[in-house]
UniProtKB/Swiss-Prot annotation:
InterPro entries: Enterotoxin (IPR008992), SSL_OB (IPR015282), Staph/Strept_toxin_CS (IPR006126), Staph_exotoxin (IPR008375), SuperAg_toxin_C (IPR016091), Superantigen_bac (IPR013307), Toxin_b-grasp_Staph/Strep (IPR006123). Keywords: Secreted, Signal, Virulence. The C-terminal domain contains a V-shape binding site for sialyl Lewis X. The keyword Signal applies. One of its GO terms (cellular component) is extracellular region. Belongs to the staphylococcal/streptococcal toxin family. This is Staphylococcal superantigen-like 11. Homodimer (via its C-terminal domain). Interacts with host FCAR and SELPLG (via sialyl Lewis X). Coiled coil: none annotated. Residues 94-196 are annotated as: Sialyl Lewis X-binding. The keyword Secreted applies. It is found in: Secreted. It comes from Staphylococcus aureus (strain NCTC 8325 / PS 47). The gene is sl11.
Length: 225
């Protein structure tokens, strides 16, 4: 066997048996070779998409969708949950949180949920700050925890907006989706003890994107990475 073929065979064997290539000249850290699943790559792509916020909008409802035209931009928002019953044909004084779901090149934007009532009171800067606690598991027995404030700007806020913005914060500041999220979760605890959970190994379920909670009653937000 030619030396060239021997080298190729040896290289292939090394990959099969060790799962990575090593070299004495320039060792490679295992972390740089970790392969993310397609599902995790898809989550990273989705939660890195641009989002758009529009306040005090009016629209009309037809066949399970609400059409808005902010700044002459056509936006169709699909209603998925309880908001189907909450809105009549003509809708006004609402805010919309938009993440584009369609991939075609048309000028129209399709989004899901994210409709809330416009604030009834005027606020200086924010509605409230809540405690954001982020715990990272180092190994099976060791973890680190940090605490900071998270600003809520709406009296009513959709689970879609909370989920999307929190994950974007974790992507930007804590490397979410650089590795597999496994059992990572976000937990939103309310003043009455109720809570909402976002599982970070999957996209927020479509039927929850239209659900709305009172931002003034959020007690704390906990993240386990």
């Amino acid at each position: 066997m030619k030396l060239k073929n021997i080298a190729k065979a040896s290289l292939a064997l090394g990959i099969l048996t060790t799962g990575m290539i090593t070299t004495t000249a320039q060792p490679v850290k295992a972390s740089t070779l970790e392969v993310r699943s397609q599902a995790t790559q898809d989550l990273s792509e989705y939660y890195n998409r641009p989002f758009f916020e529009y306040t005090n909008q009016s629209g009309y409802k037809e066949e399970g969708k609400v059409t808005f035209t902010p700044n002459y931009q056509l936006i169709d928002v699909t209603l998925t949950g309880n908001e189907k019953q909450n809105f009549g044909e003509d809708i006004s004084n609402v805010d919309i949180f938009v993440v584009r779901e369609n991939s075609d090149r048309s000028g129209n934007t399709a989004s899901i949920g994210g409709i809330t009532k416009t604030n009834g009171s005027n606020y200086i800067d924010k509605v409230k700050d809540v405690n954001l606690i982020i715990t990272k598991n180092i190994d099976s027995v060791t973890s680190t925890s940090t605490s900071s404030t998270y600003t809520i700007n709406k009296e009513e806020i959709s689970l879609k907006e909370l989920d999307f913005k929190l994950r974007k914060h974790l992507i930007d500041k804590h490397n979410l989706y650089k590795t597999e999220p496994k059992d990572s979760k976000i937990r939103i605890t309310m003043k009455d003890g109720g809570f909402y959970t976002f599982e970070l190994n999957k996209k927020l379920q479509t039927h929850r994107m239209g659900d709305v909670i009172d931002g003034r009653n959020i007690e704390k937000i906990e993240v386990n990475l």
